[in-house]
Amino acid sequence: MTGGLIAAGLGLAAVGFGARYVLRNQALIKKGMEALPVAGGLNSYYRGGFDQKMSRSEAAKILGITPSAKPAKIKDAHKKVMIVNHPDRGGSPYLAAKINEAKDLMESTKS
């Protein structure tokens, strides 16, 4: 019982000192937050579903490569994406089919 009260008191003291630090150094913290990089990954998110007939550029986006990638790079990218999305490991069968379709399209068409 006493140990719990001591822990609660120490917790409240820590929160109080933390809040005091933040309030006193608010300008410094704000400047530091502005210096942090903006989350660029959210801005480059592809906002759209799959096309009816997959294009070479869509296949490249699915695999995370350029449309003019070499066959070795296509194979490596397919392997990495399939390891993460394989249906036997909890991935979606639909996404796995699209990934395989993208690989087949990239390997069959010439840039």
From Swiss-Prot:
The chain crosses the membrane at residues 4-24. One of its GO terms (cellular component) is PAM complex, Tim23 associated import motor. SUPFAM superfamilies: Chaperone J-domain. GO terms for biological process: protein import into mitochondrial matrix. InterPro entries: DnaJ_domain (IPR001623), J_dom_sf (IPR036869). Belongs to the TIM14 family. It comes from Caenorhabditis briggsae. This is Mitochondrial import inner membrane translocase subunit TIM14.
